[in-house]
Amino acid sequence: MTRWSMSMHCTLFLLFLLRLTCIFSDSDYLMGLGSYDITGPAADVNMMGYANMEQVASGVHFRLRARAFIVAEPYKKRIAFVNLDAGMASQLVTIKVIERLKQRYGELYTEENVAISGTHTHAGPGGYLQYILYLVTSLGFVHQSFNALVDGIEQSIIQAHENLRPGSILINKGELLDAGVNRSPSAYLNNPAHERSKYEYDVDKEMTLVKFVDDQWGPVARIMEDWFERENGCRSVDVESPRRVSSIISDPYDQDLMEMASSLLSTGGKTVTRMSSVARRVRSRFRHADKPRFVSAFCQTNCGDVSPNVLGAFCIDTGLPCEFNQSTCGGKNEQCYGRGPGYPDEFESTRIIGERQFKKAADLFTKASEEIQGKVDYRHAYVDFSQLEVTINGQNGGSEVVKTCPAAMGFGFAAGTTDGPGAFDFKQGDDQGNPFWRLVRNLLKNPTEEQVRCQRPKPILLDTGEMKQPYDWAPSILPVQILRIGQLVILCVPGEFTTMAGRRLRDAVKTVLKEGSNGREFSVVIAGLTNSYSQYIATFEEYQVQRYEGASTLYGPHTLSGYIQEFKKLANDLLSAQTTDPGPQPPDLLHKQISLLTPVVADMTPIGTAFGDVTSDVPRLSKFRKGADIVRVQFRSANPRNDLMTEGTFALVERWLEGRETWVPVYDDDDFCLRFKWSRPFKLSTQSTATIEWRIPETASPGVYRITHFGSAKTPISSIHHFSGSSSAFVVY
C-alpha cells in the first residue's frame, strides 16, 4: 500500500487443478477457477505501497492477475474468493464488480458471498482507490488502473463460474520457519505477558493448505488453499541508493516471491512454457488436452507487523543494528533498513523465501488427509467504524461501553518501517508529535478536542476522518465478512491486522463457533486487505506504543475490539442461521474522482528509424551460458499506456525449433527470468526505449534464441498502431 500501509506479504495460498468440462457426481462441492490479467498501466503511474513520488511504473517483471475460486454446494449456496495481485482491495472496485455480476447473474453473486482480497504487492499501479489519502502520490484517480482491476476480476469470476466441477476437499497444516520476523518487537512486547506466553513466536508460523481433489482426475486434479500467516516482503532497494525503490511492476520484494513459490509449485520446479498470440494478445500455457488446468495464488492474512527481512534491521551507514524501540540510526529513521536472507541481493532474497514456501506447500499437499465436510455459508455486514459503540471488559470487572473514532493518522506512520523508512524527522513510537508538524497539519485540518481525546495517546498528524474536501479522505463504513466451507472459516477483513490482533480475532471467533456447535473444531483463517482498505489494526496495548502499526490504526485504541465484536455477531448469525443486518452502505465516489495524470500525447522515433528497431543488439554469433549469463537488448519503443497488452506480453524470448523451421515462444512477461524496462531521456520526451533483460535460467534448453519486443505507438496524426522488433539470433549452451 502506501507508506501508511507498508507491511509485507503474508500468504493465503490457493491452488486449483480443474478440467474445463463439467460432469456430474455425488460430491459435496462444486469448484471453479478463473484467472485474468490485471497488470494495468506499466508506465507513468505511481505505484501503490510506499507513497514515494519517485516510484513510478516503468516496466514489467511479473504480470498481475486476478484469480477467482468458487466453491458451491450443488443447488445450494456458493462463495467466490478472488485473489488480487494488488496492494489491497478497493471499496470502489468491489462496488463496481458486484454491480456487473448482478447484471449478469442476478443475485447469484453479491457483496455477501464474493470476497476480493489483495496480496499487498507494493509494485503495482496505484490510483484505483476512491479515498483521497490513497490517491495523493498517484496524482489522483487513474482510470486505466481501476478499469484493469474491475475488468479482470469480472472476467476471472466468469471463467470460474463457467468451469464448475465436482470434487472433495482436504486440509493440512504445518510449521514454516525462517520466513518472517516481527518488525515491531517492542510493540509486540507491550502485549500482556500471560498472553505472549501462549505462543512460541512473535509471528505466526503455521501454514494451512487446503487440497481439492477433482472427482474425475483424482489426486492429479487438485486444488489447494493456503493461509500462511506472515508477511512476504515489501520492497526492492538498490544497495547503493537505498532510497530508490523498484519501478518495475511486481518487482521484489513483493508478489515476486509469491509468484516464485506459486510458479515452482505449479511446475514442480520446472520451466513453464507459454504461447502468445500478438494479434489477439492472448497467452495460455502449453498443456495436453486431457490435463487439468492449474491456477495458484498467494494472499494476505494477519501480517501487519511481519517482515521477510529475517536477518534483522541494520543501519546502512554503520552496519550496526538499529535502535530497538524506534528503529533509528543516530536518532534518524532514514538509515534503518531490514535485510532479507539473500542480502544484499533482493532478488536472491525473493528466490530464497519463495523456495521455502514452495517446499513447505509441496510437503503439506502430499500429506494432506483430513477431509473438509459441511455446508457452504457466509455472512456480511457494513459497519460505521467512525462512531461504533463497543462493549469491552471493564478494569474492575463487569463491562463498559467505549467508542471508536473518526479516522486519523499518527506521527509514527510518517516514519515508515524498517522495510521502507519514511523521511524528515519522524520516528516510530512517537506519542507526542512536534510543534512544526502540528502547524502543517492544522493548515489541512485542525482536529477537534473530542477527536484528540478519542485517539489518545496517538498524536494526530492527519485528521483524515474529518477531512471532507473535495470529498472523503478516508473510509468510515467498512465491510466485515465470514465465508464458510465446512470446518474451514475465512474471516475477511478490510485491513492489516498485527500478529497478536489476528490471534485475538481468530480465538474470539473460534470460541463462538465451538460453543455454538457442540464443541466442533473449526479451522479459522484471516484474509486481510479484503473488499476494502482501512490500513492497520493493532491491539490496544500495541496502540499505546505508537510504532508504525499503532499510528496507522485509524479508528483509535478500540479498533480491534470493534472488529472482534462485529465478527462475533457474524459468527453467531452464521451458526443460528439468522439474517445479518446489512448496515449502512459505503459511498460510491466514482463521479467525484479527480485525475491529474496527463494522457499520452504522441510517440516518435528519430528520422530514419522505426518503432521496434534494435538499438543495442547481442554481439554477432554470440553465445551465452545458461544459469550464469544475462542477455540484454534495447529497442526503440513507445509508451506502454497506449495498449496495456492485457493477456499479452511486452517481452518474449523465442527459441528456434529445428525440424519445424520456426520460432516458438518460451518466456514472456510472466516469467521470473525476464524483465521489460521502459525509459525515456526526460519526462516529456516523445522518444523512449525498451530494455529487455533475460537472466538465462539453469533449466533453459540449449539452442538458438532471440528476444522480441511488442508495443503500441501513438502518433500525432494517426491512431494507435502496434509494432514489434526482434534481436539477432544467439546461442544458449
Curated annotation (Swiss-Prot):
Residues forming the catalytic site: S307 (nucleophile)
GO biological process per UniProt: cellular response to oxidative stress; ceramide catabolic process
Matches recorded under Gene3D superfamilies: Neutral/alkaline non-lysosomal ceramidase, C-terminal domain
GO molecular function, one term: N-acylsphingosine amidohydrolase activity
Signal peptide: 1-25
Disruption phenotype: Increased sensitivity to C2-ceramide induced cell death.
Pfam families listed in its UniProt record: Ceramidase_alk (PF04734), Ceramidse_alk_C (PF17048)
Protein EC: 3.5.1.23
Disulphides: none
Localization in the cell: Secreted; Endoplasmic reticulum; Golgi apparatus
Cellular component annotations (GO), alphabetically ordered: endoplasmic reticulum; extracellular region; Golgi apparatus; membrane
Keywords for this protein: Endoplasmic reticulum, Glycoprotein, Golgi apparatus, Hydrolase, Lipid metabolism, Secreted, Signal, Sphingolipid metabolism
Major localization listed first in the record, in broad terms: secreted
Catalyzed reactions per annotation: an N-acylsphing-4-enine + H2O = sphing-4-enine + a fatty acid
Residues annotated as glycosylated: N325
Similarity annotation: Belongs to the neutral ceramidase family.
Known role: Hydrolyzes the sphingolipid ceramide into sphingosine and free fatty acid. Promotes oxidative stress resistance.
Protein name as annotated: Neutral ceramidase 3
Native source species: Arabidopsis thaliana
Gene expressing this chain: NCER3
